[in-house]
Amino acid sequence: MNNQSLQRAAMISEHLAPTSELNMNQTSAPIKTAKEELADFVEIFPILTNEILKELPGMDMPPQTIAWVEKMINVNVSGGKMNRGLTVLHSLQLLVEGRQLSRSEIFLANVLGWCVEWLQAFFLVADDIMDQSITRRGQPCWYRQANPISNNGTIGSIAINDSFILESCIYILIKKYFRNEPYYADILDIFHETSYQTELGQLLDLTTQPNRGDFSLFTLNTYRRIVKYKTAYYSFYLPVALAMLMAGITSTPAFSTAKDILLPMGEFFQVQDDFLDCYGSPAVIGKIGRDIEENKCSWMICQAILNGTPEQINLLKKHYGLDNPTDVELVKKIYGEIGLKKIFKDYEDESYAFLISKIKSVRIMPQEVFIKLLSKIYKRDL
């Protein structure tokens, strides 16, 4: 083991349960339950947060600024389902096929998992401002929360800058834990690429409804393009691709195969999300759905246009995109008349069968990587 590897092992060992006589790169971790893996994942969050915060005094940041950053990270990064973050570890476990991961590998996979969660937080803080969303994860969106310094207003547009800080944290953590890894540049590339793809997806999402009542852009082709870039890359491809890099996979066909399955899986996930935005309970999904009020190009409106009568579509043009309860309820009533719940159920079953068929044809990497991810989202909270 070279000096750089020894230094990295020593740094990681500081954050793990005491095993001072053990070589961190050779010691296998005991097999754990899903609940224990989640607990381990959550346990390192304050460690990573501290890595960010401890740099700030040396940058001459005053106490109130440090406190702001700490609260902003705690509110926005933690508290979700953490499925994206845990997918890195779960995928790596399956990719090494038959070998038990070392404690060091588990820790590093969880660091990358938290970087994915930080990326998600960066997107959501900005997205909530652009969409004028009300709640996130069962509490007011960050920009709507009380300003912790002035105490006489909300955080408001300061949250825009906070989203930038959240993005910067990702690269601080990657540099600290992965700078000496052979795949360091690849990790940086994929995070930069995924950020750009998601930002383009957000632009597509925000510019497909320029005039209320104009449904010309509300097509499934437009919808699929939005979803591919806004959701599928960062939610599905990124965590698995990070695990592949950690596993030493460099084959271009392997990454192409992963993308070929994970991007359609991301569309499947977003269609579920659109359905839940309309019919899901805020207590279950953690937010108040606003796709109708915001005139969004959602799967629901695209299917309504495809399956509705001319009279129903004309009514939708009059009432879709208006921010008041009466219009929203009328839109939902029309959705019910068109039978969107049945259309969604059929779509879900057909998409699941399609994805299973694609997964069964995979030979270049373990099929279970994709099966495990699909099992997490099929029939979720519906």
Curated annotation (Swiss-Prot):
> May I have one GO cellular component term?
peroxisome
- Positions binding dimethylallyl diphosphate in this chain are 136, 230-231, 270, 287, 296
**For this protein, what reaction is catalysed?**
isopentenyl diphosphate + dimethylallyl diphosphate = (2E)-geranyl diphosphate + diphosphate; isopentenyl diphosphate + (2E)-geranyl diphosphate = (2E,6E)-farnesyl diphosphate + diphosphate
Its pathway is:
Isoprenoid biosynthesis; farnesyl diphosphate biosynthesis; farnesyl diphosphate from geranyl diphosphate and isopentenyl diphosphate: step 1/1; Isoprenoid biosynthesis; geranyl diphosphate biosynthesis; geranyl diphosphate from dimethylallyl diphosphate and isopentenyl diphosphate: step 1/1
According to the record, cofactor stoichiometry and binding are noted as: Binds 2 Mg(2+) ions per subunit.
Q: Name one GO molecular function term.
A: metal ion binding
Task: State its role.
Answer: Key enzyme in isoprenoid biosynthesis which catalyzes the formation of farnesyl diphosphate (FPP), a sterol precursor. Involved in the inhibition of cell growth.
Could you say which protein family the record assigns here? Belongs to the FPP/GGPP synthase family.
**Any idea what this protein is called?**
Farnesyl diphosphate synthase
